[in-house]
Amino acid sequence: NILFATCLLGAFAFSSCEKNLYDESKQSEKEIKMTDLNIPEDFQWNLTQVTKGTTIANTQTKVSLFLDEKCSKDEKVATIPVYNKAINLPLSLPTYVKTIYAQYQSKSGKMITKSVAVNANGSYTLNIPDAIEANPTRAITRDNNKKDDDYNIEDDIKYDKERGVVYHPKKGWGTIMFEDQFPSLGDYDFNDFVANYQVLFEVSKAKEKDEYESKYIAIGLCLKAVGGVFPYNPYLRLKKIKNKNIESVMMSHYKTGEEIEVNLIDNKNPKGNLIIDCTPLVQNLDRRGSKYFNTERNALVTKEEDLPEIIIEIKLKEPKEIDDILEDDEFDLYLKRNDNGTEIHMNGIEPIAYQYPFNDKNLYPIYEDGEEEDDNYYYSNERLIWGLRVPGNVAHTIEKGDFLKAYKGFAKWAQSGGKNEQNWYNQGNADDNLLIHY
């Protein structure tokens, strides 16, 4: 787990204007609730997109890619070998990103930062004309007992010109937030279950294709809050990876390095997907006298280091092209209720063993089409959802906090079908009085 440990660490205010949600010039007559929002019928609630890009350089070299011009550590999305022929590189990027930044060493030895436009259709081309040749491969020795900021997987790949890493959603955390009252609508403070996530793919060029592929995947999960009272536990399904393709799965506590027994879910798993029981993330929580975890002002975690955190390492028998496993819905972190088996997934994802309430008139209709998976699971008739995935480390609301007041751009984003305010979670205008940052 040391291979990944140090890589891991390193919604909403909208005023009602009489009865017209979009007329901001009129005085507010009532407070808008989540259930008042006018959500477009085809809105998918996506905050990320998988881009289809190509990379090429004058010589084989190493390039790092970032979401920001400063090339901040937490905003890194990849460090990859680039060749003197075009190679396809898919990346999972926030929808607001129109430019990524490539950092590499030139022939003169200078570090160069180059901007790369991301087109409206998600395509981009990275062309490096003046890179220095990558260092030759040297033998790598891993010290599994070493846990400090000077050692991580990128220390290894720096000396191996054939290996790289791709992050999802980036080197810093993403955040998953749930409402837990499905199929009923909740209070929409989105703090019933909140966890940070980060996925790392160790990549190399495929032997017979101009693609990058991965045989090793590391996943970090950090519990931020449990503001629900129903007995739910978290599980992780990787939809494009089958149990039969697994060489090994390891789980450990990040802070202690203590190994955790892995429980893979085989029964009632007809598609044979890899499903990992992540219950250790929520065991033995210090709720500080509250019935919740880290959602009430008088019972908060006092420092970030007290948040439970686990690392999952997966080795595959055969590598997979990362294009197959980068999509958000292929990384299915979901909740399962202990007493009645209810599953809550992100919108559009079919449950595993739970009998979905197809006849519930409050839910969006599901239409089966042969073997095609319908994408209307876990939507209400009003197109509301029970799970939200954000490609950043976002704060969660206090118990009964108004998500729309906490994140002032959220309502506009949702009602525009994702066209406006795409970076609502990172605009600097959130109401910190309603938010808990760890």
Where are these regions (language model features)?
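Tryptophan-paired
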Residues: C71-K98, Y254-T256, E261-D266, P270
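Short Pro-Gly-centered beta-turn/loop motif in secreted/extracellular proteins
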Residues: V82-A120, Y124-E133
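A eukaryote-biased signal for long
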Residues: T279-Y438
